[in-house]
């Protein structure tokens, strides 16, 4: 064993016997096992595609619900756009409510809603991957569609409550206290909204209390992302504006959405690790820890697609002689997953 490996194994032994670093490494390892980067990228893409239809739909619905109250309509819309640093101003100038007859508006609104539902499907898929739900146990199209509509309802309610709370804090306080109070209220509301959304997206058999730890962390992080997102995006676009011109706005939006997606996936991974006690994980294998075997078994059983299909997983010590069993790398004598 070379000195580098000796040092790494010493670090591995240390983290496995310390709860906090073991949990952190467990979350990071599970993020990798579940291909969390790919899930975050999918959420970013579908979130980007759904953004304009959702804003058009929001503006149109507000036009009906708050008819005769243009000030309140703009307040809610501006509150939604304020969550998008830098590009919020450009969106505000270009997003307008649909116009036309009642039937045309209804058809247009339904079309926008259907176009935006992709993000809800991806979020449900991400939660199923994080909790390693076998394919055979995942809901069909119509239950997923109903969950998607419920998610939009929860988000709309959160937006209205957030706008009302921000208005109350702004009217009751002024200056720096108003800013600090607004951030605290935003963190609390984001935590509650995150918990409500996770409850909608996560399989029913997962208890609500298991969803709370990740939301307690994600809520304030979303507030930080909203409050200081402009600085992050400005850093990202320092040179992109001259090179890409208008597309720099798209780059800024994608960067912001990807950070939000990563917070979401990491929060869900933290919930799964804490609820299922998926730590300590090994940094160097072999040997595998009990948590390693539990995660790898869950990932393998996740591939069950039919009720007639049953996946079993077994583990052995050390490497296989010759890298395979008697019948070759995929033969029946292979002692790996069956």
Predicted regions mapped to residue ranges:
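Membrane-embedded alpha-helices and immediately adjacent juxtamembrane helical segments
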Residues: 1-338
